[in-house]
């Protein structure tokens, strides 16, 4: 069984299994350590800290890469009958995906869980509209990249996860392991 992954840093390469602790930078090549130290500082996490349980402010299920119909179905399975604890945006990858999701009633599951059901578009992935992080908010996101300033705030922090993992984290209000109770 594959274990869910989550990014702890500012690139997709800075990722760990959800059950792991954030790595010690001294375990990396000396040339890599300054970038890793910068990532730790920016993301406001510590070496040896568990990633699971890290509080979040926002959950984003969207982007053209991770909000296919199959992704939305997986997220809906997690959210059905539950309530999110943080602001949660669900943005289908296309208008066709949105229409099919609505035919299947997925929109109702998201709305009943307390998530915002949106039209297809870039939304928080690009932050080219009001859907953006503010200040040092931490967001679990299904987008495919993270870097400093991602999602519209120069100090906002993005952790990449699968759609089901983002949904579970939204319910718990912190980084969650989808395998534990969903």
Predicted regions and their residues:
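Fe-S-dependent hydro-lyases/dehydratases of central metabolism
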Residues: 1-182
């Amino acid at each position: 069984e594959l274990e869910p992954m989550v990014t702890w840093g500012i690139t997709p390469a800075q990722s760990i299994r959800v059950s792991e602790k954030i790595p010690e930078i001294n375990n990396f090549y000396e040339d890599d350590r300054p970038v890793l130290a910068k990532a730790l500082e920016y993301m406001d996490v510590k070496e040896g800290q568990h990633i699971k349980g890290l509080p979040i402010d926002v959950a984003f299920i969207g982007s053209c890469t991770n909000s296919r119909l199959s992704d939305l179905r997986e997220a809906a399975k997690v959210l059905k009958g539950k309530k999110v604890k943080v602001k949660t945006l669900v943005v289908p990858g296309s208008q066709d995906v949105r229409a099919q999701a609505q035919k299947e009633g997925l929109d109702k599951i998201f709305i009943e869980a307390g998530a915002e059901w949106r039209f297809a578009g870039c939304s928080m992935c690009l932050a080219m509209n009001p859907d953006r992080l503010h200040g040092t908010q931490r967001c679990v996101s299904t987008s495919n990249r993270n870097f400093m300033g991602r999602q519209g705030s120069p100090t906002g922090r993005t952790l990449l996860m699968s759609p089901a993992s983002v949904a579970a984290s939204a319910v718990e209000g912190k980084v969650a392991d989808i395998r534990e109770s969903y």
